[in-house]
UniProtKB/Swiss-Prot annotation:
Official protein name in the record: Mitotic-spindle organizing protein 1
Predominant cellular place of this UniProt entry's protein: cytoplasm
InterPro entries: MZT1
Record family assignment: Belongs to the MOZART1 family.
Subunit (UniProt): Part of the gamma-tubulin complex.
Functional description taken from the UniProt entry: Required for gamma-tubulin complex recruitment to the microtubule organizing center (MTOC).
Keyword Kinase: no
Amino acid sequence: MPPNDRAEKQAAAQQAVNILHEISTILNCHLDRQTLSICISMIEKGINPEALANVVKELRKKGQENQLEAAAAAAASSSTTVPSRRR
């Protein structure tokens, strides 16, 4: 592939990612450019887009649950910690 064609393809791919990122931002999807690029690549390789969307939703849900559990554990541990006395 000639260098010029490759550069044009890269520019077109970057433009597509930028447009999809703008759409993602407008729709409050909270997907960064890297994540969008990965999703695009997976879809281009034949992954079902709807299934991929469901996986992303499930991962987000689990991530939020883990953050809540970690925050609760941190709060519980800080409330039960007795400050040490210095002599």
